[in-house]
Amino acid sequence: MSDNVMTRERPDVGSYEDIAAAASRTTGMTDFGDGVHEEGLRVLVEDLASPEAGLTPRGNYFQRSEVKSALVGVLLTQAQFAAHPEHRDVPIERPIFLMGLPRTGTTILHRLLHADRQSQGLEMWLTQYPQPRPPRDTWEADPIFAAMQQAFTAHHIESPEFMGIHYMDATTVEECWRLLRQTGKSNSYESLANLPRYTDWLKNQDWTDAYARHKQNLQLVGMNDVDKRWVLKNPSHMTALDALMTVYPDALIVYTHREPVTCIASSCSLSAETTEGHSDTYVGGVIGHTQLDLWSRGFHAFHDARAKYDQDQFIDIAFGDLVKDQIGVTRRVYDQFGLDWTPEVEAAVTDIDREAKEGKAAPKHSYDLKDYGLTEKQVLDAFDR
């Protein structure tokens, strides 16, 4: 990620071939693996060039960078897979997946669960450049880590409003959708532009191959921490619960709840802040209606699929409960899944709880559903079961 993404311009996004060639030039690599990513990214690039996307010169640069980042991720992981063939033998046992509508508390709960020294998550820089996780005391000397940290510092200065919505830096444990992008399948693209054809394509996909590669990435990143339990989060896991459970049959699912009117308004605000100045069409009501479609679709897909599985592998967390008692809710998760709640775990969780309520990561965010052409009734009807 670069602060230049915020200012540079292009007359167009370019073709898939052009972007793939640019990714190869950046990395010096040409092995894109089995090519499973290609169909989705071709549909995506064509949609980005359409009048419906309505990209501005800034938007062209930003969106091209997003596609290129996915392809760079493919190239880098292919090289790492080849360099470390033993990654395929790394077990992934009872991983915890947090999911739910955006803005339901998954970020803070993710960080609370990750506080346990027996847990591991995907740090931001390793979601973009997967490799066996180096020792923590070596990160600052890594040129990739240093460049990403510098970029986040610049982004924080340029866009403090965004960081108030969702604070990030290179060290924070983050969502794992960047791994899914390596197969061309990600709901994240739908939150960055108006993409009707890509959305229709994605609705009809089997995500099993995406989660198979997701697992392979976790095996790679966790090679040096094989005894640690994975704690992962991504709201859009709701969309593909069957595929996730096929690849991770012993997964432990933490599902977060909040009334959808607030969730959708907040999600729209995040999309609007992220894409400001990038499109003449992805604004206001278009953001509202595409976000409502995306998240109501995921909500219903999750609830339709959930009943097939052992309910002991699931726990429901209400946002209100999390706000009132973050430590107590974290312990409920441990109790539900039979995990050891020790004094050391409680102390670590307490530290994260304190940090979350003060300092640079404190939430500062306001939003209004009406700004996105939606009414409360429309939202409630879309989520009615």
PLM region descriptions:
Residues 1-79, 195-211, 218-225, 267-316, ...:
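PAPS-dependent sulfotransferases, especially Golgi type II membrane carbohydrate sulfotransferases
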Residues 98-116:
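Glycine-rich phosphate-binding P-loop
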Residues 79-89:
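Pre-Walker A adenine-sensing motif
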Residues 99-101, 231-235, 319:
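Short His-Asn-centered micro-motif
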Residues 128-230:
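PAPS-dependent sulfation machinery
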Residues 93-96:
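Pre-Walker A (Motif I) flank of P-loop NTPase domains
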Residues 233, 244-269:
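Conserved phosphate-donor/acceptor-positioning beta-strand/loop module used by diverse small-molecule
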Residues 115-125:
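Post-Walker A helix-loop "phosphate-sensing" segment adjacent to the P-loop in P-loop NTPases
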